[in-house]
Amino acid sequence: SSIAQAPGDLAGRVVALEQGKSFASAFSSLAESLEGLKTSIEGEIKNTVSTLNTEMHGLADIQAKLISAGGSGNAANSLLDQRDKSIAAISEFVGLSADYKLRGDATLTLGSTGNGPFLVQSKSAGVISVAFEEGKATVYAGTGASITATKQATSGVLAGLISAYDIINQTG
C-alpha cells in the first residue's frame, strides 16, 4: 500500500481514511437495508397470518351451512364448490392435509402428515399465529387450549416468508 511505502505522506493517509469511511458507510447502508427488509417481511407474515385465519373461519362457516343443508341438493353443490375454493385458497398459504367426511365437510390439518394441528374441523376454525423471538419466526397453530408451536408449516406462502425472515436474521 502507499502508506506502507511512504508513511510520512499525508495524502496517502487521507485517501486511506476516506476509503475507510466509504467502506463503513456502505456497511451501515447495507445493515439499514437488511433491517428494512426484515421489517417488511415481518409485516407480510402478519398480513398472511391474518388472511389465513380469515380464510379458515370462512371455511368453517361454509361447512356449518353444508352440514345444515344435509349434504345433498343444489344448495349443497354450491356449498361444496365454495368449500373447495376455500380449501384451495388456504392451501396457497400453508401446506395441509384434508380429510373429507361423508356429510361433505372437511377436516384440515397443518402439514402433509395428517397429524399436524387442526386448521379447520367441521364447523370450527383453528388459529395460526407467528411469534418473532430471538431472531426466529415460530409458527403456533391449533384450536382452543391446544395452540402450540409447530414445525409443520413447511410449504406455501407462509413458509416462504418465514424462511426469508430467518435468513435475513442470520445475515444481519
What is each residue range found by the language model?
Residues 6-16, 20-23, 27-83, 97, ...:
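Alpha-helical heptad-repeat coiled-coil segments that mediate oligomerization/polymerization in large
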